[in-house]
Amino acid sequence: MTEISILNDVQKIIVLDYGSQYNQLIARRIREFGVFSELKSHKITAQELREINPIGIVLSGGPNSVYADNAFGIDPEIFELGIPILGICYGMQLITHKLGGKVVPAGQAGNREYGQSTLHLRETSKLFSGTPQEQLVLMSHGDAVTEIPEGFHLVGDSNDCPYAAIENTEKNLYGIQFHPEVRHSVYGNDILQNFAISICGARGDWSMDNFIDMEIAKIRETVGDRKVLLGLSGGVDSSVVGVLLQKAIGDQLTCIFVDHGLLRKDEGDQVMGMLGGKFGLNIIRVDASKRFLDLLADVEDPEKKRKIIGNEFVYVFDDEASKLKGVDFLAQGTLYTDIIESGTETAQTIKSHHNVGGLPEDMQFELIEPLNTLFKDEVRALGIALGMPEEIVWRQPFPGPGLAIRVMGAITEEKLETVRESDAILREEIAKAGLDRDVWQYFTVNTGVRSVGVMGDGRTYDYTIAIRAITSIDGMTADFAQLPWDVLKKISTRIVNEVDHVNRIVYDITSKPPATVEWE
């Protein structure tokens, strides 16, 4: 059985990746309607799409001009498949350009648009059913369509864009110059839902139960009767992977819990108790803290930290695997967001991810990444569907490199202890305030900055701890959480009084973007 045959019974909409910073959100929004969706390379052929058998195709936006020497193209036979196609921004320009219309640099036409604009609908359309004649949308385009291809007609325009929405209903081709996938397009979700349900004919019946069945079948086909190693960190992602793999292959799974000395307070014992005890996973606990901390001594660059941890993690696995027989696979809790942040063919690398860019080329295992098409909120939903308790599913996200990337600069035991203890206080107080479900992620960071303070009658010169708390839906964008002042005050007071070598607390009020969630 191939992956394609496993997916044949699942309706799906494929998003072709042309490099937009928002393209992963298109798939995310479509999934909200109960329709499976994923990104594929713009280089995909019509024949490959026939084999995947999607009910719809979306051409994403992108930063390039259709006239650029390195412009991303499309197999022209895709337009002849008879499958509904929606072109967004660059996608609309590409449809126009390839089918005989005219696209010009927007500056030449005097109609460059960035930011919110008002869309004026001139005709009724299935794509805009149930939305008002005038609506706010997010425009972000350098080129613009000035002549549409034969068979197309105008659906909507804006003050600076003569063709903001076009369609050819006979061929099921649709184009919009704006981005419906972002919240700034007020009726964007309605538009995408109209495309998925009304135009593509989606049933809207895809769920985590479907995903579980699909992944279990894929895992069994991939693994066969061979054995899998999973690195457990104690975080949500690896825990969910562990339970999913256990359900798929049972005792063919061996979990290795590497205690690299960079864990949160009491985390090692909690991992063994929850997953080893309650779920019966076969877990080997390895104390490798000295190996990791020795390698990380005096290392300040965050990318070097990630690479060292990623490499050493695999070497520890090699050591343990050599004691076992017939282990061929390494499972990881890589998410969709991890892959995107590590860069794709069309997108710039933001930072290498510990589950993506830190692995050596001569790694001795094949990789299995069952969650690499899911966003964080979907992983939590998967955990619930697998019968996992909420205390595991809603556990705070924790990066593979652990506290190494929450200690700025060189790592010392003293700095690690300040983060462990301050983070435990933060989590305790957030829970006491009943905010643990409202705040998507929260943790502390040792900034590496020392400052002068006064404690008792004496002068201090100690570390500054930063609190990072964010709200988010899928981890792709985030806002800083507006925690109540009384809660922040209590957290600050407890940390400076209970944690040695800390005399100052600051609160990170930066959204993502421009910042990432983690400081390193």
From Swiss-Prot:
Its EC number is 6.3.5.2. Keywords: ATP-binding, Glutamine amidotransferase, GMP biosynthesis, Ligase, Nucleotide-binding, Purine biosynthesis. Residues 12-205 form the Glutamine amidotransferase type-1 domain. Signal peptide: none annotated. GO terms for molecular function: ATP binding; GMP synthase activity. It comes from the Bacteria. The active site is at residues 89, 179, 181. It catalyses: XMP + L-glutamine + ATP + H2O = GMP + L-glutamate + AMP + diphosphate + 2 H(+). The keyword tRNA processing does not apply. ATP binds at residues 233-239. PROSITE patterns: GATASE_TYPE_1 (PS51273), GMPS_ATP_PPASE (PS51553). One of its GO terms (cellular component) is cytosol. Pathway: Purine metabolism; GMP biosynthesis; GMP from XMP (L-Gln route): step 1/1. Residues 206-395 form the GMPS ATP-PPase domain. Pfam families: GATase (PF00117), GMP_synt_C (PF00958), NAD_synthase (PF02540). Homodimer. Catalyzes the synthesis of GMP from XMP. This is GMP synthase [glutamine-hydrolyzing]. It comes from Streptococcus pyogenes serotype M12 (strain MGAS2096).
